[in-house]
């Protein structure tokens, strides 16, 4: 810049000596050196025209005007008789822009910053701007602790006054904090204060938040944390006097010194509220109540201000101002808080608009709204609409924007901006275990059918042991009040023996219809009716199965496997869901509780009841919700009525990707104990362990799972940011470390009758596993990978360390 001023000054001086003060009439204007810039464009930028009388000041203005276009790096104005001769040197045109050595800053971000400064391909090159960019980038590296970093712009000339621009980065290494000193602290130790910092001079291995790499922004955040720490404990006159950041000679070490004045502790003596309270003084006063003698607390003061704003926001005052001014009395060490409130204007909603819903119909989104058009703006109602859209599970993100209507003092438009995700999935599952080998499963599910909000599923399984098909449809808004209607039909041909379960075949089909009744924003009750026909055959005699048949008045021979039995059952189905998750998929905060159950009704062959309770709670441990603790439980119980038992084919099972990972699906819990209907079969069957009595085969233990009428499963997960994933895909990929445990038991098992066999009525036989899981919302649907190692198991359990599913998340 200084060179430019010197050049202009020298030109002005030379012009003065050439032209003199008397001026002359310009008869013609000629340019020399123009290449890219048209003559007409150059003439338009000049204040001098043909026929004008010009003097030294006009020439100076002409030079300044041509420089101001940004097209020239040198301008000279000469007189040739009555002709004005303008000699220019155009700035070169940027032909290409490349980067080298930048690891901390992505190319796209650099291009955006360059374009914001006017540096882009096809534009002229301003070397002064380049110098500013170099300095700005180096300042950025300094702010993140890389003090040895350098950025150089390399300009390579090309034909036709073009150049290649290359930014060469030498990022260096981040300076590490050697020591943090706090001077002036008496009430709290330095270790206690630093323990709340992100920046540390020592970071234990278990601390995933602390960092020894210096960053200016993090230091500013830590200083604010320090200030809040004192203000929250009554130190109303706390002050950070100064902060020194010292660099070691090799620029690899940082010493930080923070000088503070603690002051004394102060107690609140009272709160006085004044201003325009919009008629809500009583409610506001409730928010400002304090306990006598309570210590001054800065965080509580801020929360009080926010609560007042939220209160007024619920009544349509969209832009209230709340300011708290502490009046400190040093004599008695008290603080009186004066709160000034200006509610401002009450705003009404003109329109509610939706953006980004290319697939979902407006009506699907609009029916989730609690804010009405024409009513006053309620911030809580707008937020409820956002929560409900998130819980639909149709969108990756939902954002709200309140836009004032131009020309109106009291109207706004509420805009919901959504980013849709794939709501259809092709469900395909693969599992591999040391004992189970490979297993497959498939199906199709669409949660937002043609953008209507209907859920439609066509699921099927075909493998060595099962042929299953199901068609399900749910209309979440069967009535305008939000009553849902769902139904399904299914067919199942199940060969339990081939699934490593107890030996039997069950061919079943049925249907059910369910109504859902919303109670409030978070609770829904469900009720419905169902019918199922079960046709049992090839039942190999085993204790739990024969016990059930006996309760049904059936006493087949234990010496024959060719037994058959069929039932027709009608059920009353019920359920309750409490859902306060922050979004429908990949939640980060909130709780979901789901209770489902059924009980047979008159006209049924069986008489039993069955219920399952699922819970999931997400607790974020950071403000960005990237680190989350997830706790899950599942409890199930069922039993017979009127002296009958619950059918064995309705038993609960555990093991697999949705319960206890690391175990093969459905293999945790009681195992079949067979009657020796044909002893010679067992001699060649390694799965059976038959006892003998008086030289004859007695009962035979096996590894075939039979499930139980009671189940308990729990899981603790630590959800973490996925490494090596860009921010663009952060909302689509989830990584977690987990600890699963679970057990299944049979409350009707008589351990005294079967001494010498495992006590399958004992609920304390808990299995445990630990591992890592990766979930990805892919274009095909949710993909789930998990690897788990069982570390507590029992005889007969079957491990399946690696499991992979498409279409299943939790």
Swiss-Prot record:
The keyword Membrane applies. Residues 24-91, 92-172, 175-263, 266-344, 347-421 form the POTRA domain. It is found in: Cell outer membrane. The keyword DNA-binding does not apply. GO terms for cellular component: Bam protein complex. Residues 1-20 form the signal peptide. InterPro entries: Bac_surfAg_D15 (IPR000184), BamA/TamA_POTRA (IPR010827), D15-like (IPR039910), OM_assembly_BamA (IPR023707), POTRA (IPR034746). Keywords: Cell outer membrane, Membrane, Repeat, Signal, Transmembrane, Transmembrane beta strand. GO terms for biological process: Gram-negative-bacterium-type cell outer membrane assembly; protein insertion into membrane. Disulfide bonds: none annotated. Belongs to the BamA family. Part of the Bam complex, which is composed of the outer membrane protein BamA, and four lipoproteins BamB, BamC, BamD and BamE. PANTHER family: OUTER MEMBRANE PROTEIN ASSEMBLY FACTOR BAMA, SORTING AND ASSEMBLY MACHINERY SAMM50 PROTEIN FAMILY MEMBER. Part of the outer membrane protein assembly complex, which is involved in assembly and insertion of beta-barrel proteins into the outer membrane. Constitutes, with BamD, the core component of the assembly machinery. This is Outer membrane protein assembly factor BamA.
